Amino acid sequence: MDEYIKKIKGNKNFIYLSLAFIFLIIAFINPKFTMKKDISNYIFVVDITQSMLTQDALLNGEKVSRLKYAKDISQKVLEQLPCKTKVSIGMFAGVSVAATYTPIEVCENFSAINETIERLDWRSVWAGNTRLRASMINLARLIRSFPESAQVVYFTDGEEAPKLHAFNTEDLNQFQGANNWLFVGIGSDEGTPIPKYDNKNQLIGYWSNESFALQPGVAQISAQNAGGRDNNVSNASYDRYLSRLDEKYLKSLAQEVKGNYVNGSDLKEILSAMKKQPSAWRDDTEVQLRNIFSFFALLFFIMQFFSINRVKSLLKIKYGKS
């Protein structure tokens, strides 16, 4: 018996093949265990006001509109989210945010969510002004109507129209409900004119500095100009209103509502900031070990064909004797 055991020990090929067979059997059994995993719910809010049509965002080496960039980066974020995460898509205009649906699971509904983002259009606006600050209260109210709580990822350039002053600045001192909301800044800090389009999405000029109806972010058809749209545009390049990503304001707003800000130019930074947002709930996730045991089965199967002496002889054949 001892001699038989010694014989087996000396036969490395038999040992490797046996181990490969054992691991293969275990892989077929597919042992599993469960572990707790944080699950997140989100609402991606995309600013669709006209200032988001400013072409100062860089995508694949060319300048595109802020809205197009916001849609692209939000789709890239969506691709990185793990299964069981739930996402809703919201649109911001005026003083409020409209959700297309309550948060739905990303893997089962990826195509639907992706298409929703793709179809976002500035012509869907329902109000003519852009009051980002005032939208905080309405957004918190919207989230409270969801079946489950959701974290906010807000894609915007920070443009307020009309500009904030003492009489129209919303008091957020008592505001609650925005903890850890993430503001993603879209655009650049170089002044760029805001294009003005007609209702067929044809360029007719640029927003001017003077005309109230053409203030940055004001939509063509709104409560301010219902009954007719002002087609006036800036008469000269010097008269064009220059729009910029207002990072200073977005950082200040984020701090005021106990949220966070990140520049939208870096996908990794956005994902990193999202990981810091608290999860909505914890779930039992099943972890399968089949792939691990299959790997070891393959490894030991391959090892039976190799030995140190065989490797040395192969090296000698290739490179010659040293």
Protein language model features and the residues they cover:
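…and closely analogous acidic/polar surface helices at protein-protein or active-site interfaces
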Residues: 39-40, 52-86, 105-109
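C-terminal signal-anchor/stop-transfer transmembrane helix together with its immediate cytosolic
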Residues: 1-37, 276-322
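DG-centered beta-turn motif at the end of beta-strands
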Residues: 24, 47-49, 89, 139-143, ...
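Juxtamembrane amphipathic/hinge helix adjacent to a transmembrane helix
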Residues: 43, 253-293
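Alpha-helical transmembrane signal-anchor/signal-peptide segments
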Residues: 32-50
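Second-shell loop/turn segments in exported
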Residues: 57-65, 99-104, 120-128, 236-241
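Short beta-strand-loop
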Residues: 86-119, 142-143, 273
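VWA/integrin I-like adhesion module and closely mimicked acidic/polar interface patches used
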Residues: 158-242
